[in-house]
């Protein structure tokens, strides 16, 4: 039972903020179920018009509707509340209270404070939703079964309230009784249906029940297509914007686009005089078809009809009757949802179940030609009316029967209505991206964003007030400690007022400073074209909504970092924007392997070395998503700040393969070299079955599969499926299915354990996932440790060596180790040095150096130089300074007494930015001062504004003449600006502070290390 609540508007709300307004939103609660509306900014008469739906378990519950005022820094303020008893709604006429203004009550019962009013519509849905089944036995309601909450082909953002329907009924014109009879024909004599024991089924008639035969017989009084359209128009007028039902749990059997409008496709499929319907009956050979008229029910809120037919007799079975009910759950002119339920009591165990099929017709994507297209999605499930031991076999028969029948259905429909070619959809990418242009923000708009606030306004008014006071005031006599030119406060009140004025002016000056820094648009990876052939990922960043504000000004300086297959792209920084507009396009260089996920992270910019504040993050999973659905999508952000503000990003994502040739064959050839064994290309039928088994997109292809055992409490025999992006396991024992998969990128480690008695003498492959990854596959995990890592154990492979080599090759292809990344960076650095002939240091003379650090260390120069020696002291010092994955090349002689090397590491301070540091160092001997000169050029990768500058360091070490075994160190610092930016001072200051901290830490460690060595030598 569903309670529908529509929150329309409120009026005369009290002002809760100092600006004389409120930021109201509504929170609804029924039992443990909670929902809330959006926040309406600065409004005392807000309008929402949002619908909500709650499951009702107890009529004694109360619906609590609270109005609150959003506060960004403290707890939200309570405005008022309404309590409505569920039993009051249930006992009302038509189970509806109508649309009524309710007074908001204060928290304290005795208070007479006027809290305003709220307009609500509260009612019960007159019939259960398609997912709230009322039958008994094995059936499960949608509110309790996670299997029924699959992703809908309709936009999930509209999932506010369920659609209304009659009792769930109706399945398509196609049946699957033949599949059942083939399964049960061997047991037809001993196994009789629960409710059909009096019926005898001739085994000679069990052949073509899965080929329904329809001969259309319409009576004169049945509804015409005109009355059918009138009924739908009446239903459309009463549509309340409810959410179309989600796909049913049995799976999707048709998901196709057609070049026709949704309303026309609906007429083609369900009009009483439809020529398609007649052609389908002729093709499938069904006779004695009786199509009832469409009738309005529930005061026109739903439309329903009944169809009956007779299956033709065959050599195996006699004729079988079927009754089908079709009910419109939704019809609003754009989206149509029809639930069909079919009963076939004459098939074996036919009295124990009904089959339900859901047809969803919705608008398709926009085509370049401008023509309308529609998306047809057909899903199914079994509704068991009573328990039966043959449930697993019935489900298998239904699945195969529906698959065969709807292949005929889709092929016939494609002959009547032109399907959309995938090439036409691909062209839509160019059209979708061509309209995106990143427009620079004007200085006037930026000034309004910075200065249109209470701080500036109050400071301006106070300044005018003080100025007028100075004009009219008489100068006071000099007293106390005052003298000419110095006028001190003469009272505590004057002192407080002076302090307030100083603080206000300071804040205004800070705003002016930030405004001057933010005037110029900052660079990004927007417009950088991808290189190479392969899988090309294109991401269009449109806008962000309700990003969290971390600055005292109530705004943020957001930018986005996209990461896929180890490659990153960074957007520009939008200053003082909580709802920024980007309109930027990012292309990732072509990848040999199709990407599995796209990680999206939103940061607030405050200097390249400051601790990054994450405003939210999201993950776009290409394996679980249909790429066509990502062409225009709103991605909700995760994280404490993002979820509190309900932050979202508007993205357009396209994934194409730009290389020629056979993608599958090329990839398999690469894997064959790693495995050392030929890998056969799987047939299209096998690949299609693999994709449907795990719900994968069409570009996913099967590489190999192995029979093995999954080790849990008890070994489970099944098959391990390996593709370019996933590891999947499937087993079906006595009708109990075990199915899961996880990504190669989720695997942290793969181990091979020696054979044991429990593994039946076979080696065990242990796959350990990264913390909190692959949680959807935890059903197959052997253990789940305290760090949140899942471990999967597989053993008893028929050919263990081939399976192990294939697994390791695929894992290595998707997961590069840090050493491999270091090696790649070193090779790239060497090639760059050779091509530029050590030209990195040619510009050092143009850099302005300033001394930033100097001290005298009680260590000899020879020991100090171990800091650059590449040995244990070098490594420990870098780790102590927060440098991860540190690697360095050996010193090589460039010319007389000049040596050079390259280093690579990840700095903890910028690791949140996915930043890496590469540097080139040169050292030369200074004989006249008995010391060394070390020069270093550092380049920051993946850091905001990192491509705007290079860092230059110069270390001068010389032996102290006054004290033996003492080194005098001076460090000089300079920045080589490659591009102009108004943030030079801000970036320079940020880097300088962090550099000084790092030098103190490094030199302090060096002194302690030398002291410990001296003590060890004295002991020995």
UniProtKB/Swiss-Prot annotation:
One of its GO terms (cellular component) is membrane. The chain crosses the membrane at residues 454-474. Keywords: Calcium, Membrane, Metal-binding, Repeat, Transmembrane, Transmembrane helix. Residues 134-172 are annotated as: Disordered. Its cofactor is Ca(2+). InterPro entries: At1g03370/At5g50170-like, C2_dom, C2_domain_sf, GRAM, PH-like_dom_sf, VASt. CDD domains: C2, PH-GRAM_C2-GRAM. Induction: Up-regulated by Cold. Down-regulated by salt. The lineage of its organism: Eukaryota, Viridiplantae, Streptophyta, Embryophyta, Tracheophyta. It is found in: Membrane. This is C2 and GRAM domain-containing protein At1g03370. Residues 249-421, 848-1010 form the VASt domain. Residues 1-102, 517-635 form the C2 domain. It is a single-pass membrane protein. It holds the Pfam family GRAM. Residues 134-144, 158-172 have a biased composition (Polar residues). Its main location: membrane. Residues 689-752 form the GRAM domain. It comes from Arabidopsis thaliana (Mouse-ear cress). Gene3D superfamilies: C2 domain (2.60.40.150), Pleckstrin-homology domain (PH domain)/Phosphotyrosine-binding domain (PTB) (2.30.29.30). Ca(2+) 2 binds at residues 17, 69, 71, 77. Ca(2+) 1 binds at residues 17, 23, 69, 71. One of its GO terms (molecular function) is metal ion binding.
């Amino acid at each position: 039972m569903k309670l529908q609540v529509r929150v329309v508007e409120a009026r005369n709300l009290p002002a809760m903020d100092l600006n004389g307004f409120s930021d109201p939103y509504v929170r609804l609660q029924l039992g443990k179920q909670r929902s809330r509306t959006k926040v309406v900014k600065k409004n005392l008469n807000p309008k929402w018009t949002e619908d909500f739906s709650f499951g009702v378990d107890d009529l004694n519950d109360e619906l609590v509707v609270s109005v609150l005022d959003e506060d960004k820094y403290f707890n939200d303020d309570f405005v008022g509340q309404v309590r409505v008893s569920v039993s009051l709604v249930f006992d009302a006429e038509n189970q509806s209270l109508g649309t009524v203004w309710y007074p908001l009550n204060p928290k304290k019962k005795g208070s007479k404070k006027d809290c305003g009013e709220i307009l609500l519509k509260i009612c019960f849905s007159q019939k259960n939703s398609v997912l709230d089944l009322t039958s008994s036995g094995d059936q499960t309601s949608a509110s309790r079964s996670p299997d029924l909450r699959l992703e809908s082909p309709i936009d999930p953002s509209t999932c506010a309230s369920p659609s209304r329907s009659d009792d769930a009924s109706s399945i398509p014109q196609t049946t699957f009784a033949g599949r059942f009879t083939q399964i049960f024909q061997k047991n037809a004599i001993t196994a009789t249906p629960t409710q059909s024991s009096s019926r005898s089924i001739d085994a000679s008639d069990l052949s073509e029940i899965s080929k329904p035969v329809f001969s259309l017989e319409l009576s004169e009084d049945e509804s015409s297509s005109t009355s059918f359209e009138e009924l739908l128009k009446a239903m459309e007028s009463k549509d309340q914007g409810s959410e179309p039902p989600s796909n049913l749990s049995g799976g999707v059997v048709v998901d196709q686009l057609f070049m026709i409008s949704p309303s026309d496709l609906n007429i083609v499929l369900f009009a009483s005089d439809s020529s398609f319907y007649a052609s389908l009956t002729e093709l499938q050979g069904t006779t004695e078809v009786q199509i009832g008229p469409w009738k309005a029910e529930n005061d026109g809120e739903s439309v329903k009809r009944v169809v009956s037919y007779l299956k033709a007799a065959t050599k195996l079975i006699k004729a079988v009757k079927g009754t089908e009910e079709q009910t419109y759950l939704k019809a609003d002119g754009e989206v149509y949802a029809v639930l069909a339920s079919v009963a076939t009591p004459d098939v074996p165990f036919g009295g124990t179940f009904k089959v339900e099929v859901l047809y969803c017709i919705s608008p398709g994507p926009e085509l370049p030609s401008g023509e309308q297209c529609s998306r047809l999605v057909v899903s199914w499930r079994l509704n068991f009316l009573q328990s039966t031991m043959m449930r697993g076999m019935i489900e298998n028969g239904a699945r195969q029967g529906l698959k065969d029948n709807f292949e005929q259905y889709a092929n016939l429909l494609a002959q009547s209505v032109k399907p959309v070619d995938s090439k036409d959809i691909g062209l839509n990418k160019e059209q979708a991206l061509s309209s995106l242009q990143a427009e620079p923000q004007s200085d006037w708009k930026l000034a309004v964003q910075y200065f249109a606030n209470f701080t500036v306004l109050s400071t301006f008014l106070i300044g005018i007030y003080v100025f007028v006071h100075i004009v009219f005031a008489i100068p006071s006599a000099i007293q106390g400690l005052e003298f000419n030119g110095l006028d001190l406060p003469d009272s505590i009140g004057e002192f407080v007022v002076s302090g307030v004025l100083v603080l206000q002016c300071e804040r205004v000056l800070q705003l002016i400073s930030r405004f001057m820094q933010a005037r110029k648009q900052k660079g990004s990876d927007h417009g950088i074209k991808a290189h190479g052939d392969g899988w090309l990922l294109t991401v269009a960043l449109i806008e962000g909504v309700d990003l969290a504000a971390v600055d005292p000004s109530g705004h943020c300086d957001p930018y986005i970092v996209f990461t896929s297959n180890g490659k990153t792209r960074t957007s520009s920084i939008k200053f003082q924007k909580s709802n920024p507009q980007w309109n930027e396009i990012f292309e990732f260089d072509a990848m040999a392997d199709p990407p599995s996920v796209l990680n999206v992270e939103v940061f607030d910019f405050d200097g390249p070395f400051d601790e990054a504040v994450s405003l939210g993050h999201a993950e776009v999973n290409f394996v679980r998503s249909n790429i066509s659905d990502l062409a225009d999508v709103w991605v909700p952000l995760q994280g404490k700040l993002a979820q509190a503000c309900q932050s979202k990003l508007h993205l357009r994502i396209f994934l194409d393969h730009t290389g020629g040739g056979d993608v599958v064959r090329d990839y398999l050839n690469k894997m064959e070299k790693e495995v050392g064994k030929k890998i056969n290309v799987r047939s299209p039928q096998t690949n299609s079955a693999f994709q449907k088994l795990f719900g994968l997109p069409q570009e996913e292809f099967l590489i190999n599969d192995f029979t093995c055992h999954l080790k849990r409490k008890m070994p489970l025999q099944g098959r391990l499926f390996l593709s370019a992006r996933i590891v999947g396991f499937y087993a079906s024992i006595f009708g109990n299915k075990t199915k899961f998969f996880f990504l190669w990128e989720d695997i942290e480690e793969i181990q091979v354990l020696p054979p044991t008695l429990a593994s039946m003498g076979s080696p065990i492959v242990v796959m350990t996932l990264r913390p909190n990854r692959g949680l959807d596959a935890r059903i197959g995990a052997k253990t789940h440790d305290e760090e949140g890592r899942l471990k999967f154990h597989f053993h008893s492979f028929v050919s263990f060596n081939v399976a192990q080599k294939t697994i390791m090759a695929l894992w290595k292809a998707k997961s590069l180790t840090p050493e491999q990344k270091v090696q790649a960076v070193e090779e790239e650095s060497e090639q760059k040095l050779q091509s530029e002939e050590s030209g990195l240091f040619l510009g050092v003379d143009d850099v302005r150096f300033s001394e930033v650090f100097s001290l005298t260390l009680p260590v000899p120069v020879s020991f100090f130089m171990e800091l650059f020696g590449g040995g244990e002291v070098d490594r420990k010092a870098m780790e102590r300074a927060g440098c991860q994955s540190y690697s360095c090349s050996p010193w090589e002689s460039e010319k007389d007494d000049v040596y050079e090397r390259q280093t690579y590491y990840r700095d903890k301070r910028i690791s949140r930015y996915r930043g890496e540091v590469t540097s080139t160092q040169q050292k030369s001997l200074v004989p006249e001062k008995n010391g060394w000169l070390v020069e270093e050029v550092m380049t920051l990768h993946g850091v905001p504004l990192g491509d705007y500058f290079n860092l230059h360091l110069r270390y001068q070490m010389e032996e102290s003449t006054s004290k033996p075994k003492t080194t005098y160190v001076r460090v000089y610092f300079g920045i080589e600006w490659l591009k102009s930016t108004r943030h030079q001072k801000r970036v320079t200051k940020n880097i300088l502070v962090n550099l000084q901290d790092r030098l103190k830490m490094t030199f302090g460690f060096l002194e302690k290390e030398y002291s410990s060595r001296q003590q060890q030598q004295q002991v020995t």
